[in-house]
Regions:
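Short loop/turn microsegments at loop-to-beta-strand junctions
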Residues: 31, 56, 142-144
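Structural microenvironment flanking redox-active thiols in thiol-disulfide oxidoreductases
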Residues: 71-112, 123-125
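Short, internal strand/loop/helix patches
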Residues: 106-142
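A short beta-strand-turn-helix
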Residues: 34-56
Length: 180
C-alpha cells in the first residue's frame, strides 16, 4: 500500500510544475516599463528608462505591502537609501498592490525615502516574478531583487523569500558597479 501511495505521489509531483526560480538572468536586458507608483505618499508615474538615465536601479519585488517581511524589508531599504544614493543608485520597490496602498506604504514603511510602484501583470510576467502556490499564480510577486546597470543590463539577481540579504547583496552589487 505504501509503495502505491509513494508511486502516486511521485507521479503527481511530475504533473505539478515546480516553483521555478526562472527570474531574469544576470546579463539580460531589463524590460522597460511605465506604471504608477508613490513617493512620500504622492502618486507619480514611474518609468524604468527614465530612472536608468540617472544611474543604476535597484528594482526589488516584494509580495504584499504591510505584511511583516515586506515591512521589515522596506525599513531595511529605507535605512540604506543614503548608501545607495552615494553609490549613484535609485531604489524602487514593486508589488501588485493598488495605488492607495502604495501611497500609504511609501510613507509608513518606506519612510518617504524611496518610491514603490504597481507591478502590473505585464511587469510580473516580463520579470518572471510571479509567486506560485501549488503551481498556480497567486497574483503576488516573489521576493526578488535586481540590480540594473545604467545601460539596462541586469548585473545581479537575488530571489529569496527571506528579506534579510536583499539590501546587503544589492548594495554590494551597486558599490561594485561604481568602482567599475
Amino acid at each position: 500500500m505504501i509503495k502505491h501511495v509513494l508511486a502516486a505521489a511521485a507521479a503527481l509531483a511530475l504533473l505539478v510544475p515546480a516553483a521555478a526560480n526562472a527570474e531574469l538572468a544576470q546579463g539580460a536586458v531589463a524590460p522597460d516599463f511605465t506604471t504608477m507608483g508613490a513617493l512620500a505618499g504622492k502618486p507619480m508615474k514611474v518609468n524604468l528608462k527614465a530612472l536608468l538615465a540617472k544611474g543604476p536601479v535597484v528594482l526589488y519585488f516584494y509580495p504584499k505591502a504591510f505584511t511583516s517581511g515586506c515591512t521589515m524589508e522596506a525599513h531595511a531599504f529605507a535605512e540604506a537609501t543614503g548608501d545607495f544614493a552615494k553609490a549613484g543608485a535609485t531604489v524602487l520597490g514593486m508589488s501588485n498592490d493598488d495605488l492607495p496602498t502604495l501611497q500609504k506604504f511609501s510613507t509608513a514603511e518606506c519612510r518617504d525615502k524611496f518610491a514603490v510602484a504597481a507591478a502590473t501583470k505585464d511587469v510580473i510576467k516580463a520579470y518572471d516574478v510571479s509567486l506560485k502556490v501549488a503551481g498556480i499564480a497567486s497574483g503576488l510577486t516573489k521576493r526578488t531583487s535586481y540590480v540594473i546597470a545604467k545601460n539596462g543590463k541586469i548585473v545581479m539577481v537575488h530571489s529569496n523569500m527571506d528579506y534579510k540579504d536583499h539590501v546587503k547583496l544589492t548594495l554590494e552589487a551597486v558599490k561594485k558597479l561604481k568602482k567599475g
